[in-house]
């Protein structure tokens, strides 16, 4: 199944507007998933499809040093020694098994379980969602919230709970999403984080890019997803892409949303500088030759 492209985004400002929910450039997956900003992507002629479990990409960004520093927080991604910083290009090896690399401290985990201005799970609207989730998964839930199955259940539940995928919203709070049952990937991730935290599961929102391979090609989209601390690791949960589980996907993080207070929109501007303007999928041999 292929994405239907509505309009392509080619500027950093477009990435900011998609985070804010403004109508600039979007695509839709089927009829049951939210919209995403399309990022220009090309594939070198000597790269064959389907893609392997690891890909090598050149990523043009506004602030390559900052973008590279963010990637150090994950396993399954590595920067090539051959960097074109003067052209704002990062050469990256990216695995489809990307996951957070840094083990959080007790204080960090406490922060990712907190009720905040954006992830406001103590609000009545979100508590209603929590009750609905527990009613549906009570037999599986038990008293073990640390199992990755809970993350899968949260993903499935939020994917079905948001019944009107749409890009007409600004970046909404969890309680707003709980009431509207509408939104794009940011709304999916905010509500999923709220549900997890209400269950005492540390959860965070990641902003970045997802590269998706479907039957006829490869495309890249500005995106937001979750990571939840389950089974002693950061486990990815992506309710917005739940219906695309059969497709091969590569996640390229740009920002961990840490400021969930009143100044959250200022914090999101950090993601702008790390978001790709252009992605080129290259062969492994090209990058090895460049490193040598």
Q: What are these language model-derived features?
A:
Residues 2-16:
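Bacterial N-terminal signal peptides that target proteins for export
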Residues 211-292:
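Active-site rim recognition segments
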Residues 164-172, 205-215:
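Catalytic cysteine-centered active-site loop
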Residues 150, 154-156, 182-209, 226:
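Cysteine-centered nucleophilic/redox motifs
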Residues 30-101:
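Intrinsically disordered, low-complexity N-terminal segments that are enriched in acidic
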Residues 108-183, 191, 258, 268-292:
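Secondary-structure boundary elements
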């Amino acid at each position: 199944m292929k994405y239907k492209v509505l309009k392509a985004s080619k500027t950093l400002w477009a990435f900011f507007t998609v985070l804010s929910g403004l109508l600039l450039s979007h695509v839709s997956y089927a009829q049951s998933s939210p919209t995403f900003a399309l990022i220009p992507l090309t594939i070198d002629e000597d790269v064959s499809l389907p893609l392997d479990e690891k890909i090598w990409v050149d990523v043009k960004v506004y602030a390559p040093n900052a973008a590279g520093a963010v990637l150090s927080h994950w396993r399954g991604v590595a920067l090539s020694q051959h960097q074109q910083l003067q052209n704002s290009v990062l050469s990256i090896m990216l695995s489809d098994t990307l996951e957070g690399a840094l083990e959080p401290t007790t204080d960090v985990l406490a922060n990712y379980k907190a009720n905040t201005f954006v992830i406001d799970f103590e609000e009545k609207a979100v508590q209603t969602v929590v009750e609905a989730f527990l009613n549906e998964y009570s037999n599986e839930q038990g008293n073990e919230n640390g199992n990755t199955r809970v993350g899968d259940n949260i993903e499935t539940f939020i994917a079905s709970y948001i019944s009107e995928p749409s890009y007409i919203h600004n970046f909404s709070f969890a309680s707003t999403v709980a009431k509207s049952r509408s939104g794009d990937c940011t709304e999916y991730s905010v509500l999923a984080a709220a549900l997890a935290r209400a269950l005492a599961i540390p959860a965070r929102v990641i902003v970045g890019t997802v590269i998706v391979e479907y039957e006829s090609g490869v495309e890249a989209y500005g995106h937001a997803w979750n990571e939840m601390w389950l089974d002693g690791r950061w486990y990815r949960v992506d309710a917005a892409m739940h219906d695309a589980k059969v497709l091969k996907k590569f996640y390229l993080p740009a920002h961990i949303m840490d400021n969930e207070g009143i100044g959250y929109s200022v914090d999101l501007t950090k993601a702008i500088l790390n978001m790709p303007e252009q992605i080129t999928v290259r062969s492994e041999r090209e990058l090895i030759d460049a490193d040598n």
